Amino acid sequence: MKYSIIIPVYNRPEEISELLDSLSRLSPCGQEYEIIVVEDGSTKPCEAIVKGYEAVEPVRYLKKENAGPGPARNFGAEAAKGEWLIFLDSDTIIPAGWLCAIERSLGAVREDWKCNYAAFGGPDRASADFTPVQKAISYSMTSFLTTGGIRGGKRKITRFFPRSFNMAVRADVFREMGGFAPMRFGEDMDLSMRIVEAGYHTSLVEDAWVFHKRRTDLSKFGRQVLNSGRARIALSRRHPGSLKLVHLFPLCFVIASVLVLPFDVLFCLLVLFDSTIKQMKDGQGFPSAFAIGLMSIGASYVQLWGYGLGFVAALFSKTAVSENINNERFYN
């Protein structure tokens, strides 16, 4: 078997239903695969939903005590049979051509990379039926203006490190690395960094994109990016030298937005223009595109301020690396 698709879930049965429905519509790629759903101690189980798909796709349901998404992925990997372990978040929806894009990319790997090619990931985007807030959040998490090119996309200014919302690792390398570390945040980046540090190659597969719903409101999004800022410090302590100038951008943004009023005005106008144009290219009419553009300003401020404040908080914390993961907050 070539592919094992592993999905950790905690109290999100409705998301699993949508995700499995999308996976049931995958275009044939000529390779055998399996789907493993790992219930991480949920109080709202999705077992009945998963069992309902057993007749139409090769899905298995596993359950364990709650320990967080990293350990849940490791649990699924232990039961996996595939040569490649593909990790998806439960809040993704998969287009029909996703697995075929992965198969094509593996067939096109450079000859001098084939022995040491160990991991890849795909980008994410917003679906046309996402809410305006979800589209604004998606913009803020994928725009070059707000991320500096460190997330999935064509314009990269750092090495690509796959993230677990849409990430694949060669099974033998995953086991060699010991799987995901028991970190509170940033366990996917940590694994990607360890893979690269061990001398393996990684890449972005641009055509293997997924729809990623992310958070449904700005308060949940704020908690997520606060944790992302904390994770960056944890990663820099585990991987000395990994902290780059681009990672300081959110903190610099916070300082500039407080001290320099013209900077705020210019940034808001740039985001409004860029997001509105992007939404119109995606088929939105001008009024709705402009409304999402306005929301994108708010989402961008939440992202950059949340990340920057989390970054500073972790910088002065001794527990940024050692805190364990064990509950719902780490799926929110």
Task: Give the location of each predicted region.
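Glycine-rich, basic loop-to-helix element that forms the pyrophosphate-binding segment
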Residues: 64-80, 101, 157, 161-165
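Membrane-embedded multi-pass helical conduit in multi-pass membrane proteins
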Residues: 253-321
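Conserved donor NDP-sugar-binding/catalytic core segment of glycosyltransferases
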Residues: 97-135, 208-209, 213
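Short, acidic, metal-binding catalytic loop of nucleotide-sugar glycosyltransferases
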Residues: 21-32
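Catalytic donor/gating beta->alpha subdomain of glycosyltransferases that bind UDP-sugars
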Residues: 181-243
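A conserved acidic beta->alpha catalytic loop
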Residues: 22, 36-48, 66-67, 89-95
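Acidic donor-binding/catalytic loop of UDP-sugar-dependent glycosyltransferases
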Residues: 44-45, 92-105, 193
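Short aromatic/hydrophobic "clamp" motif used to bind/position activated sugar donors
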Residues: 85
